[in-house]
Amino acid sequence: PEVFKSELEECKKMASTKNIDLKSFVFPGHTIGNIDHLAGLGFTSYRSNFVNTLGYPVQRPDKLWEHKSTVEFDIRPNWSMKYHVYRYKKIVDRAIKNRTNCHFWFHPSMPNQFLTDIMPALFEHIDKRRDEIWPTTMGEYTNWLNQNHSI
């Protein structure tokens, strides 16, 4: 825990020099641990669950919010670009139908082809359904939860 805490304290210090306040956390490589220390370090949420869930965030007793991921933006080699677009749109539609969260995530190193061939069609679909869905960030959603939910 001491290495975890000291590394995060240094990250927060470096981020603050750029006027960035780190509040949400993603565990590297899905190696989840030391969760009990996140709230004490000023974090308000973390992303967990790499089993693709359409669900809801859960608040821990320490007020830290756990956001379950739905799917990673990535290129599946056996799928056509058209099928990728179809699948991602279907995930959004299922979240709307079932009134659940849809938590997309990606690595900055994702293939450029995703940015050019999939994201525009998916974001257009989300925009068309904007009256049924709230496109937001994990930080904005956590702030909303903290203002509108009590444990």
Predicted regions and their residues:
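An active-site-proximal "capping" alpha-helix that borders the catalytic cofactor pocket
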Residues: 4-18
